[in-house]
Amino acid sequence: MSVIFVIFIIIINILIILLSSIFIRNYLRGKKFKNQKYLSKETIILITGGCLGLGRELIHLLISLYNCKIINLDIRESEFHSMEELYNKNLKNIYCNIAKIKDIIKFLEENDVNINEIDLVINNAAIANNLPLEQLSLNNMISTIEINLLAPMKIIKSFIDYYNKNKNNQKQIHFVTLCSVMSHIISANSSDYITSKWGLFAFMESLRNEYLYNNKYIFTTICPFATNTGMFPNFIFCMDKKWVSKQILQSIVLKEQIKFIPDFINFPIYLYKFLPSCLSNLVQYYIINPFSKNLGRRIENDNLLK
């Protein structure tokens, strides 16, 4: 009994230290954020999938707080008019199926976008099926990988190649990629989505290390927990998208390398990885897997195969 009590006390102390450190870190982070002058009305931002969810919330914050100029690549033309009316000259919407574009630089130039003026690239567009493997078609799986993984890779690769060819252009460019906590917490019924996000996280981490001492390129990877954007409509614990978008904005302004949202999700992720397989299997079966039985945003319903 005394051993169990000691273990309990140790766990409580660890949790207190963890929560205290998160509170202090967020307090200092908030003060630093208020003093930063990174974004302004001169900042030009390229974002993918900005018509819905976190993308739309980010566009709202970037324009309302900093008066930034936004170029939004999306396929949802029905949203274009209302957004342009709301944000006037600060927003330019361009119809684009990012999964099918081979040369993003050429595409942007054809749409009268000056590549040299872009300061920030936000890879936000993503889809989720959330179906067991047996119910997934190959077309579904390929589309998920194309949109969630290959499209951000092609965009970043194209921009870096373009800037490397233009040696006279010494401006700094910041790549922000919205990944997911599910790149670290593996659940059932999401094999294609998790594969794409795991690969995307690895890609961003590899690039960050590749350009570690190159100040020309900045890489920020955002890993949020499930958010009420409609991608996981039946998920029980969804974070508020307005709050999440503010956390993402802080990470962008502070040029953070990796940001998990919420912060404390780090602790259970790494604790889970240290569990012996017999215990991790129990956690997986009774805690993680039941939460994955929800309907995601269907590719067919979103016309993402056009």
Where are the predicted features?
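Conserved NAD(P)H cofactor-binding loop of Rossmann-fold oxidoreductase domains
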Residues: 124-130
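Substrate-binding pocket helix/loop in short-chain dehydrogenase/reductase
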Residues: 132-133, 137-142
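Active-site helix of classical SDR
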Residues: 156, 196
